[in-house]
Design a protein with these regions (language model features):
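C-terminal, non-catalytic tails of nucleotide-sugar-dependent glycosyltransferases
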Residues: 143-156
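Active-site loop/turn elements of alpha/beta-hydrolase fold enzymes
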Residues: 18, 44, 120
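DNA-recognition element of transcription regulators
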Residues: 102
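Catalytic donor-sugar/metal-binding loop of nucleotide-sugar-dependent glycosyltransferases
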Residues: 95-96, 105-123
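Short acidic donor-binding/metal-coordinating loop in glycosyltransferase active sites
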Residues: 8, 16-19
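Residue-level signature of catalytic and energy-coupling elements of molecular machines
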Residues: 2, 17, 84, 108, ...
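Acceptor/aglycone-binding surface of glycosyltransferases and processive sugar-polymer synthases
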Residues: 1-5, 10, 23-98, 125-135, ...
């Protein structure tokens, strides 16, 4: 239960930890509403989180671009994301965890979605350390490989 029960013209989501600017929801909404795009998301141009977290994010995005080339997006996990209900209905989403962002972007690539990005600031979480640990890199790689193999099989 979640995205699949949404029935509006647009579907959006954002993390609730205070690192992402709530006003960005309005900005991505205005951009998708006033354009012919399937998906609009933010791109974190200024980041105030820890250096190691920035490094993990850099390599994550680099690995994504290597395994899933051709997608017109810079920052895969940045939110808020908003997409049309019509586009959502075409996606074949399976993830119900942190990989959902990447899966949405993989599906956007597969479906040749028209994507827009808006720059944003990513604030430091002053209340807790990041949930992303070094060991998460191995989980990232595993999921990327699974989805890349799935894409190869789908294209046969």
């Amino acid at each position: 239960i979640g995205l699949e029960v949404a029935d509006g013209k647009y579907i959006s989501f954002i993390d609730g930890d205070g690192q992402m600017l709530a006003e960005d929801v309005v900005i991505v909404y205005q951009k998708i509403k006033n354009s012919d795009l399937d998906l609009v998301k933010t791109c974190r141009y200024i980041r105030y989180d820890e250096k190691w977290r920035k490094a993990i994010s850099f390599f994550y995005n680099l690995l994504f671009k290597v395994l899933f080339p051709g997608l017109n997006a810079k920052d895969i996990n940045s939110k808020p994301k908003i997409f049309t209900k019509k586009f959502y209905d075409k996606m074949e989403l399976k993830s119900d965890d942190w990989f959902a962002d990447a899966e949405i972007m993989i599906e956007a690539r597969r479906l040749k979605a028209k994507i827009g990005e808006v720059p944003t600031i990513f604030k430091k979480n002053e209340h807790r350390p990041s949930f992303v640990k070094f060991s998460a890199i191995f989980e990232f790689i595993k999921n990327f490989i699974i989805y890349r193999i799935r894409e190869f099989k789908r294209n046969k």
